Each structure stands twice: as structure tokens, then as C-alpha cells.
Swiss-Prot record:
One of its GO terms (biological process) is transcription by RNA polymerase II. The keyword Cytoplasm does not apply. Residues 1-25 form the signal peptide. The lineage of its organism: Eukaryota, Metazoa, Chordata, Craniata, Vertebrata. Parathyroid hormone elevates calcium level by dissolving the salts in bone and preventing their renal excretion. Acts by binding to its receptor, PTH1R, activating G protein-coupled receptor signaling. Stimulates [1-14C]-2-deoxy-D-glucose (2DG) transport and glycogen synthesis in osteoblastic cells. This is Parathyroid hormone.
Length: 119
């Protein structure tokens, strides 16, 4: 076994090395500008991917009726603009009214509109 004197010397030497290096948890070498830019870009990329994943998760349950409207033929000349169907926007007052309706009422209203607009 090691003697107490040798153990004490080793402890003093290790303490002196740790005390005089004075790293304070910082890296010993400074990072280069390219390394900092790479880390910044990686952080931005991770943040963007997290936002896209969150948005994709929120949009999974959203139903878009625009795809159904694009497949239908236009009924009026005013609906045709340079060969394309003009998209109808949902105004804020219509949106508030739609939110207040129950899902069953929305399904019935959607089916009524769908059957009325077919040629």
C-alpha cells in the first residue's frame, strides 16, 4: 500500500495543478469564427425543425376545403381570372360565425354547399 506521506503529496500536487490552471469551466482554446458560425447555424436549424414539427402536428387535424373547390368547374364568368379559379377568402366575420357553430352544423352546411355547387 502507499504510505500516507505519498498520498498527501499526490493530493497536494493535484490540488496545485487544479488551482493554478484557472480554467473556470471555460474551454482552454478559443473557438474559431467558423466553429461559432457552425454552432449558430446548427442552433437555428434545430429551432426551425422544432417549429416545423410543431406546426405539422397542429395542422394534422385541419381540413382544407380548398382542394375540393379547385376540382369543381366555375359556374360564373366572374369566377374565371386568366383561366384560373379565383380563390374565395374567408372573412373574419364569417370565421367567427363558423367557430360558433357546432361540428355537426358545419358538416351539414359543408354538404349543402358541396351539393349546391355541383353542375
Amino acid at each position: 500500500m502507499t504510505s500516507t506521506k505519498n498520498l498527501a503529496k499526490a493530493i497536494v500536487i493535484l490540488y496545485a495543478i487544479c488551482f493554478f490552471t484557472n480554467s473556470d469551466g471555460r474551454p482552454m482554446m478559443k473557438r474559431s469564427v467558423s466553429e461559432m458560425q457552425l454552432m449558430h447555424n446548427l442552433g437555428e436549424h434545430r429551432h426551425t425543425v422544432e417549429r416545423q414539427d410543431w406546426l405539422q402536428m397542429k395542422l394534422q387535424d385541419v381540413h382544407s376545403a380548398l382542394e375540393d373547390a379547385r376540382t369543381q368547374r366555375p359556374r360564373n364568368k366572374e369566377d374565371i381570372v386568366l383561366g384560373e379559379i379565383r380563390n374565395r377568402r374567408l372573412l373574419p366575420e364569417h370565421l367567427r360565425a363558423a367557430v360558433q357553430k357546432k361540428s355537426i352544423d358545419l358538416d351539414k352546411a359543408y354538404m349543402n354547399v358541396l351539393f349546391k355547387t355541383k353542375p
